[in-house]
Amino acid sequence: MNPTNPTPGITDLTNSCTDAFAYSTNVFLRDTGMRDPRRITTIHDIVVPEVGASYQNTAPDMAPFVVMQDDKVKVTAILVPHGPVFPAFAYRFDTAYGSVTFSGDTAYSTAVPRLAANTDILVHEAESFEGYQGPPALADHLRKSHTEVQRVGEIAHAANAGQLVLTHIADLTHNPIPVPQWWRWARQGYGRRVTVGGDLQRITV
């Protein structure tokens, strides 16, 4: 699709969404005096450091790098493997109150514990193939793109994370897996607090 720009970044995505909703936005601009969204947003595509990364080498060995910093927060990132997707990032937020690291969508990777070293909270995606009956091609894609829950605990342990929170939980079975089972799987190799995340949940640093 869109052969002239098949791999749009955040700037292109945002501009295309703005164009797609132009009619509605124009109505509200003229009829209600709302602010022009283009004047209240600043979009930045993340520039990947020169580490040999490409669509053929999506997550090479690298150090975390700063993507944003002000007097309240420092945000660092690292490339992670997410199947054919490039770039895919994990992010870490450091503040005076503590640190939180988000794995983002990622297959099992040593990049996450490198970024998340000694973080207060590691928020990590998780999937389970227990009882999976779908197409083999989809299973292959998912295994290359996501992390099985049974390995998330060892990632948290390697990072020395203070707490592990499961998110983006992919239950690939026909019969839903109970929350306690996700918790038990995630605790394998990790002896600290584990939380199975849910909608609208709040976790204090």
Predicted ranges, named:
Residues M1-G98, P178, W183-T204:
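Binuclear metal-dependent hydrolase catalytic cores
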Residues P81-P84, D105-S109:
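Short beta->alpha connector loops
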Residues F89-A90, A96-T101, A107-Q201:
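Cap/insert and terminal regions of metallo-dependent hydrolase folds
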